[in-house]
Amino acid sequence: MRLTRAESKAANKRALIEAAREVVGREGSKAKLEDIAELAGLTTGAIYSLFGGKNDLMVAMVDDYTSPLDLRSIEAAEPGMPLEEVVAEVARRFLRMSADPQAAGKLLFETRVLDLALNDPELLGKLNASIRSTEVDFAALFSGCEYGGATVTDGQALRLARALKALLSGLGQGVVLGAHDVSEEFFVETAQALITRRVLGLA
């Protein structure tokens, strides 16, 4: 069956994103548009036509990528659920994702993406915007939860989300690299230790 124009465009976008992931994963900041286009079976002109340029393709690639330490798949908690319970579930999920056999390869890809972004200020700016958007999604898990007899606000949830992501990313990378053999209990208790007024800030 012949593809419609929209279907063909979507298929070409998918091919370029997957090709970019492979080339960036292998070459990092040395990744070339020509290599990406060739692997996708397209031309560099297609990249400019579909994405506007290399940086927009790279951002699309990162947005499409599901990190082994990404928590967006966790459904938002029911309003009023104890914050400690939600944070505990996040920590457990983080540990399971970090212990996944594919996590090492995905961590290497993330390192290549950082190499790419740190060598391109424009791309770095776009990736930072994407990171901030992801933080807001993550914070939605905690907003509306109950803590200390009050409801966690959006601002408090965002502060906690940033602190948790930093803490659990570090612990998770240790698991991926085999540097630590930590228990679920340790992950949970360490994560819950961040639930303080000083971290959450004012309501």
Language model segments and positions:
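Hydrophobic/aromatic-rich alpha-helical bundle segments in the mid-to-C-terminal region
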Residues: 5, 124-128, 132, 146-195, ...
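Helix-turn-helix
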Residues: 11, 15, 19-64
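Hydrophobic/aromatic residues within well-ordered alpha-helical segments
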Residues: 12, 54, 61, 65, ...
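Solvent-exposed, amphipathic alpha-helical segments
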Residues: 19-26, 72-76, 109, 113, ...
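Short, flexible helix-adjacent loops and helix caps
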Residues: 25-29, 74-81, 99, 143-150, ...
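Hydrophobic core segments within long, regular secondary-structure runs in both alpha-
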Residues: 84-91, 135, 139, 185-196
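Amphipathic alpha-helical segments used for helix-helix packing
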Residues: 100-128
